[in-house]
């Protein structure tokens, strides 16, 4: 394989990746869809009004559960990223012009879908002086203004570590301030060549220093060891991270990083317990967990553990019960 599906010549790393066949998934990664009335209503609304969510467009396997709980994720800044991470299937290249009306459009989508909690994530926009910080901040403000009873979680790139850019997002006061570390120091540059491990930790620390509830994610199965995961968890907690999600890497296609291992549900349970012992206030770990999975539930859990009262206008966001994709729930189903 020397040509990418879109017709361009493969990068050397892509050609090397393509030499490794796509891996067969283990039995525990099979997902059973359960469509409830809330999901059916949201799906009908989204189709009827031409609304776009990452949940549908990325084919997320957890869409049924999240939509049933009136939670969804939106991607802003366009569909092209200025950086290439070896696990991510978002297109890399020169992005188009910023749509200054996008914050309003996203806020209207949140309103039309009747969401209780919205996660907003952004492509990296290194072509912009502020890295897209204004767009992220304005989207938070627009959602809150139009949907006062909706919680907002913002998942940002690192804005090249520019404190002023990060501060713009913090000042918009999202319920959760998130930046994903994704992997461990030893393989970080191989997996995320345009990012820096310490810089990512610094972004999280800035959020914590300004009173944010801070969240991050680690993807397992890209070449790390369990000991390295534990060390990264300690680094994240030391940086001020309150909430952590642990996920299994699923290879999007042959030109992406090969899967190094399938992490068993039992290992996710052990790592989840380790994260709680380290001091994380909210932990979600499992093979099919994704960073925005049951995000509102994790926020509510962290708020209660911090001793913060959940505001009246967000009191409908609950942290009770288990989540289907948590490793412990998965093991219970597997028997």
UniProtKB/Swiss-Prot annotation:
Organism domain of life: Bacteria
Keyword flag Cytoplasm: yes
Chain ranges of the Radical SAM core domain: 67-281
Family matches, as Gene3D superfamilies: Aldolase class I
Parts of the chain that traverse the membrane: none
Stretch forming the signal peptide: none
InterPro entries the UniProt entry points to: Aldolase_TIM (IPR013785), Elp3/MiaA/NifB-like_rSAM (IPR006638), LIAS_N (IPR031691), Lipoyl_synth (IPR003698), rSAM (IPR007197)
Record bears the keyword Transport: no
PROSITE patterns (alphabetical): RADICAL_SAM
One term of GO molecular function: lipoate synthase activity
Family in the record: Belongs to the radical SAM superfamily. Lipoyl synthase family.
Name of this chain's protein: Lipoyl synthase
Annotated organism of origin: Kocuria rhizophila (strain ATCC 9341 / DSM 348 / NBRC 103217 / DC2201)
Lineage: Bacteria, Bacillati, Actinomycetota, Actinomycetes, Micrococcales
Recorded name of the encoding gene: lipA
């Amino acid at each position: 394989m020397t040509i990418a599906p879109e017709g361009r010549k493969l990068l050397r790393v892509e050609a090397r990746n393509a030499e490794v066949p796509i891996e067969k998934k283990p039995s525990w990664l099979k997902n059973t869809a359960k469509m409830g009335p809330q999901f059916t209503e949201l799906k009908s609304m989204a189709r009827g009004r031409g609304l776009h969510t990452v949940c549908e467009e990325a084919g997320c396997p957890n869409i049924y559960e999240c939509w049933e709980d009136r939670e969804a994720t939106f991607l802003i800044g366009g569909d092209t990223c200025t950086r290439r991470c070896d696990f991510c299937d978002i297109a890399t290249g020169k992005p188009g012009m910023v749509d200054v009306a996008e914050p309003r459009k996203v806020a209207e989508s949140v309103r039309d879908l009747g969401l209780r909690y919205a996660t907003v994530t952004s492509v990296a926009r290194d072509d912009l002086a502020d890295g897209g910080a204004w767009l992220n901040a304005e989207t938070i403000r627009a959602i809150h203004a139009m949907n006062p009873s909706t919680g907002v979680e913002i998942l940002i790139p690192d804005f090249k570590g520019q404190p002023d850019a990060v501060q713009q997002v913090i000042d918009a006061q999202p319920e959760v301030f998130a930046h994903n570390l994704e992997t461990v120091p030893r393989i970080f540059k191989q997996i995320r060549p345009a990012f820096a491990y310490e810089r990512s930790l610094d972004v999280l620390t800035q959020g914590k220093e300004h009173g944010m509830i801070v969240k991050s994610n680690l993807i397992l199965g890209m070449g790390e060891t369990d000991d390295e995961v534990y060390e990264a968890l300690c680094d994240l907690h030391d940086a001020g991270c309150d909430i952590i999600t642990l996920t299994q890497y699923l290879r999007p296609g042959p030109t992406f990083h090969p899967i190094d291992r399938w992490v068993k549900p039992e290992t996710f349970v052990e790592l989840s317990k380790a994260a709680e012992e380290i001091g994380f206030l909210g932990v979600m770990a499992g093979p099919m967990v994704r960073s925005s999975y049951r995000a509102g539930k994790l926020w509510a859990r962290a708020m209660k553990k911090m001793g913060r009262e959940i505001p009246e206008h967000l009191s409908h966001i609950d942290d009770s019960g288990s989540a289907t994709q948590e490793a412990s729930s998965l093991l219970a189903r597997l028997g």
